Amino acid sequence: MSGTLVLVRHGQSDWNLKNLFTGWKDPDLTALGVEEAKTGGKALADYGIKYDIAFTSVLTRAQHTLKIILDEVGQPGLETIKDQALNERDYGDLSGLNKDDARAKWGEEQVHIWRRSYDVPPPGGESLRDTGARVWPYYLTEILPRVLAGQKVLVAAHGNSLRSLVMVLDRLTKEQILALNLATGVPMVYKLNADSTVASKEVLGDMSGAH
């Protein structure tokens, strides 16, 4: 068995609260989001991992979540790599719009297709497949080799960028990944085999409230 990979979605952001499409826009965490990150950090502290390196996106909500978690686990100075490859899915023309307003403009069925299909992007944006096309190569070149070398790696990112990873790690079909939501601030701990397959997965919290 090789190293450990921990994935955690950022805590609730201001735009999550306001029901806006966020994508690459850059709101910070709400007070609840801060508490979610602290809860996730405490769960990881109790789990007892000491990390070798962390990865996050270039967006504030993921970086803030990571900072809170690192404080909770007692590693505030941990080496951190920030890359837009881990950014949230780009919602294009939907970014910044209220989801109800978008439904009024384009119709509920069309917005549902953009949100929940695997390979149909919104205007000017990315589909989940597009998101995976940048996340997965980055994982293979930058993150996986460290895990296979025995390192313990923490990744704080976004719902769709992490779903792109979970889809491959958990060997989910397109239909299964579209039905999967990741709760904010809830860590997932993967232990990998030497051939990069998953030896075990633990969820440190409640995924039932995911949205």
From Swiss-Prot:
Q: According to its UniProt record, which residues of this chain constitute the active site? A: H10 (tele-phosphohistidine intermediate), E88 (proton donor/acceptor)
This enzyme's EC code(s): 5.4.2.11
Is-annotated flag, keyword Isomerase? yes
Keyword Transmembrane helix in the entry? The reply is: no
Recite the UniProt keywords alphabetically.
Gluconeogenesis, Glycolysis, Isomerase
Site label Transition state stabilizer, positions: H158
Any Gene Ontology biological process: glycolytic process
Instruction: Give the pathway.
Output: Carbohydrate degradation; glycolysis; pyruvate from D-glyceraldehyde 3-phosphate: step 3/5
Identify the residues that bind substrate.
Answer: 9-16, 22-23, 61, 88-91, 99, 115-116, 159-160
Pfam families given for it? His_Phos_1
Q: Tell me the InterPro entries matching this sequence.
A: His_Pase_superF_clade-1 (IPR013078), His_PPase_superfam (IPR029033), PG/BPGM_mutase_AS (IPR001345), Phosphogly_mut1 (IPR005952)
**Could you tell me which SMART domains the record lists for this protein?**
PGAM
Reactions performed catalytically: (2R)-2-phosphoglycerate = (2R)-3-phosphoglycerate
Q: Name one GO molecular function term.
A: phosphoglycerate mutase activity
Primary role: Catalyzes the interconversion of 2-phosphoglycerate and 3-phosphoglycerate.
Q: How does it assemble?
A: Homodimer.
Q: Which family does it belong to?
A: Belongs to the phosphoglycerate mutase family. BPG-dependent PGAM subfamily.
The identity of this protein, by name, is 2,3-bisphosphoglycerate-dependent phosphoglycerate mutase
Origin species: Rhizobium rhizogenes (strain K84 / ATCC BAA-868) (Agrobacterium radiobacter)
* Chain's gene name: gpmA
